[in-house]
């Protein structure tokens, strides 16, 4: 079968890899270079963790995700993942922490509850002030995202995927599995896959309101030299205090410390200027002030803007439309599942998986005891 994929980010590349392995002839269209620095998935790191609050469906999917990443590491010949563990902090009774603990109990995932003093003692890069409760899990870690994307591009090219960079799609016809390029060229296939990230509503207006482009700013920090050894044992941090909370990514494999908040801007133009003003970078860094010990000793390196594609309930949209599949598994938590979603799509295309079941699974809505 001839398959045409729009978008060469992590989802498009994982779909291409899985469909190629299924024996299909795959063409990949990308509006920019490949990898595209403006893609949602092209950054130093992304996180994988079981901690999902009450969302047991997504927590269950993480085990599958780890298996699929292992398959990819074998194909790549390198493991682009660093285990860090996961630390949740928040005020006493924080719903995210209590719900995560209940889900972990149900799924048999190892964790320990910590108090503020224990957090500061075990992980001296983090400050104890303001912590009412904490949960630490040894599972979870950092996916080296930009290196993964480059590796997937190499695999796709070596496997025979036709990659067309610098090709902007003007219109999509899912019923005919056809696209019209900005220069007027028509490209058709037997099956169309649209993995266009924040550009999806422009290509398919029916998704206006179902997903919204959201400009997000992260700050990248250089830790003080005296804390570098402590950072080597520090877990990723998800903090739910102070309103919208913050995240902190350890400086894995030579990358900086990364931080930002959990809020969605729900604004911005993905074709707009990606430059981050110094004050915006400082604001993103400040989200971690309450949680990073000796915060003022960190040096702000830069800020970076990327775009999430946010659904109102933060559930992934993976669904067939005519002779096309729409892949919009984002809302800021999709990267970890990309190889699994690519595999599941290939199974559905081969008739081995029910499309409706796949859509429910991707939305995190499968029963917790489903096999």
Could you describe each region identified by the protein language model?
Residues 1, 182-191:
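Core beta-strand elements of the Rossmann-like FAD/NAD(P) dinucleotide-binding domain
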Residues 21-41:
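Glycine-rich FAD pyrophosphate-binding loop
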Residues 2-28:
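N-terminal Rossmann-like FAD-binding beta1-loop-alpha1 element of flavoenzymes
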Residues 17-21, 79-81, 191, 198-322:
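Active-site substrate-recognition segment that forms the wall
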Residues 287-371:
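C-terminal catalytic lobe of FAD-dependent flavoproteins
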Residues 6, 29, 187-199, 342:
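Short hydrophobic core segments
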Residues 45-122, 131, 245-246:
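Dinucleotide-binding Rossmann-like beta1-alpha1 core, especially the glycine-rich loop
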Residues 71, 91-159, 164-165, 171-174, ...:
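Flavin (FAD/FMN) cofactor-binding and adjacent substrate-gating region
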């Amino acid at each position: 079968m001839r398959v045409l994929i729009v978008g060469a980010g992590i989802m498009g590349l994982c779909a291409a890899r899985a469909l190629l392995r299924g024996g299909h002839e795959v063409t990949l269209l990308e509006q920019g270079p490949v990898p595209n620095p403006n893609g949602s998935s092209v950054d130093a790191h992304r996180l994988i963790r079981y901690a999902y609050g009450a969302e047991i469906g997504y927590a269950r999917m993480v085990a599958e995700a780890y298996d699929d990443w292992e398959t990819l590491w074998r194909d790549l010949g390198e493991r682009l993942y660093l285990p860090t563990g996961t630390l949740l902090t928040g005020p006493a009774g924080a719903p995210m922490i209590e719900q995560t603990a209940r889900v972990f109990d149900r799924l048999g995932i190892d964790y320990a509850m910590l108090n503020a003093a224990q957090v500061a003692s075990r992980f001296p890069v983090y400050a104890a002030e303001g912590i009412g409760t904490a949960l630490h899990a040894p599972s979870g870690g950092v996916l080296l995202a930009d290196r993964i994307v480059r590796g997937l591009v190499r695999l796709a090219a070596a496997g025979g995927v036709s990659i067309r960079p610098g090709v902007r799609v003007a219109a999509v016809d899912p019923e005919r599995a056809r696209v019209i390029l900005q220069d007027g060229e028509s490209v058709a296939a037997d099956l169309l896959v649209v993995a266009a990230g924040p550009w999806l509503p422009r290509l398919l207006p029916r998704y206006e309101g179902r997903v919204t482009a959201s400009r997000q700013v992260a700050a990248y920090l250089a830790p003080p030299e005296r804390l570098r050894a402590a950072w080597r044992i520090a877990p990723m941090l998800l903090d739910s205090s102070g309103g919208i909370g913050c995240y902190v990514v350890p400086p894995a494999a030579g990358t900086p410390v990364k931080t930002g908040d959990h809020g969605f801007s729900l604004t911005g133009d993905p074709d707009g200027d990606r430059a981050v003003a110094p004050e915006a970078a400082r604001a993103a860094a400040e989200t971690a002030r309450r949680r990073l010990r000796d915060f003022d000793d960190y040096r702000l390196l830069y800020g970076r803007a990327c775009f999430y594609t946010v659904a109102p309930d933060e559930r992934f949209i993976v669904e067939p439309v005519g002779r096309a599949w729409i892949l919009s598994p984002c809302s800021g938590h999709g990267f970890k599942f990309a190889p699994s979603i690519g595999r599941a799509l290939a199974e559905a295309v081969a008739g081995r998986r029910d499309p409706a079941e796949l859509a429910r699974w991707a939305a995190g809505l499968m029963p917790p005891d489903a096999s």
